[in-house]
Design a protein with these regions (language model features):
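Long, charged, mostly alpha-helical binding arms that flank functional sites
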Residues: 1-103
Length: 103
């Protein structure tokens, strides 16, 4: 759906060109925004402001890597959390719940 709530159509001229969006925000932001949009089986309106929010989200995640302490010793705890996360993500992706799997 277009930002105005109508179905996207070349005839109406309300189609979002993915190449333009990727040029402005990047492919990772574009893909993540599409996953955040909502349940896979529902029509959701495009929202350019949402792209800006996802860009901030991605930037925060990238900034977290700068704060990683390479001397952290509790590897077992990290591995437990990692395996729990992988299990949850796998289940949600299998159920096409992309929007909740990345949230």
């Amino acid at each position: 759906m277009a930002e105005d709530g109508r179905k996207m159509s070349k005839r109406r001229g309300n189609v979002v060109n993915p190449d333009d969006v990727i040029a402005e925000y990047g492919a990772d932001v574009f893909r993540t925004y599409e996953m955040f949009m909502g349940p896979f089986d529902q029509a959701i309106s495009w929202n350019t402001q949402g792209m800006k929010g996802v860009k901030k989200f991605i930037d925060k995640i990238i900034a977290l890597f700068d704060k990683v302490d390479e001397n952290y010793q509790d590897e077992a705890k990290i591995l437990t959390i990692l395996h729990q996360t992988i299990k949850k993500l796998t289940q949600e992706i299998d159920e096409f719940k992309f929007n909740t799997s990345i949230a």
